[in-house]
Amino acid sequence: MQCPTCQNTDSRVLESRSADTGKSVRRRRECLNCSFRFTTYERVETMPISVLKKDGSRELFNKDKLVTGISRACEKTTFSREAIIDFVDSIESQIIQDSNKDIKSSQIGELILKGLRKENEVAYIRYASVYRKFNGVKDFVSTLESLKGSSKNELASIL
């Protein structure tokens, strides 16, 4: 690993520990030339995921786009920034496990809706209104009724 101050490639590892909930390794290093201490992170390299858009184009999966969209849906709710990032991490893990390098944007949207429905109904409605392009009150009402119906079914199954 190259030292950030003197660019020497010889260093020794002082400490290693798991980071990012086991997805990476954090290492404290010391340069053998100038004794500067620095931190590095090692992560497993994953194959890039292509998102197949509705118009037929492809783009690389962008985790930040999910964080931004979900953050907007979760404004003024109990979702913290950390919870949103954890939520996006879980969606990314599902995508990596379920896909073979390509996934449709509609599948990503449905994964988000499924997760938001369980976590926060307000965020679910907000995200659904943009994702499903609600045109009016009828769209909101039908989505609210489906939420209400599933809540009744869940309650009935518990009782």
Curated annotation (Swiss-Prot):
<comment type="similarity">
    <text>Belongs to the NrdR family.</text>
</comment>
<dbReference type="GO" id="GO:0045892">
    <property type="term" value="P:negative regulation of DNA-templated transcription"/>
</dbReference>
<dbReference type="InterPro" id="IPR005144">
    <property type="entry name" value="ATP-cone_dom"/>
</dbReference>
<dbReference type="InterPro" id="IPR055173">
    <property type="entry name" value="NrdR-like_N"/>
</dbReference>
<dbReference type="Pfam" id="PF22811">
    <property type="entry name" value="Zn_ribbon_NrdR"/>
</dbReference>
<keyword id="KW-0804">Transcription</keyword>
<keyword id="KW-0067">ATP-binding</keyword>
<keyword id="KW-0678">Repressor</keyword>
<dbReference type="GO" id="GO:0008270">
    <property type="term" value="F:zinc ion binding"/>
</dbReference>
<feature type="domain" description="ATP-cone">
    <location>
        <begin position="49"/>
        <end position="139"/>
    </location>
</feature>
<keyword id="KW-0547">Nucleotide-binding</keyword>
<protein>
    <recommendedName>
        <fullName>Transcriptional repressor NrdR</fullName>
    </recommendedName>
</protein>
<dbReference type="InterPro" id="IPR003796">
    <property type="entry name" value="RNR_NrdR-like"/>
</dbReference>
<feature type="zinc finger region">
    <location>
        <begin position="3"/>
        <end position="34"/>
    </location>
</feature>
<keyword id="KW-0479">Metal-binding</keyword>
<dbReference type="GO" id="GO:0003677">
    <property type="term" value="F:DNA binding"/>
</dbReference>
<keyword id="KW-0805">Transcription regulation</keyword>
<keyword id="KW-0863">Zinc-finger</keyword>
<comment type="function">
    <text>Negatively regulates transcription of bacterial ribonucleotide reductase nrd genes and operons by binding to NrdR-boxes.</text>
</comment>
<dbReference type="Pfam" id="PF03477">
    <property type="entry name" value="ATP-cone"/>
</dbReference>
<dbReference type="GO" id="GO:0005524">
    <property type="term" value="F:ATP binding"/>
</dbReference>
<keyword id="KW-0862">Zinc</keyword>
<keyword id="KW-0238">DNA-binding</keyword>
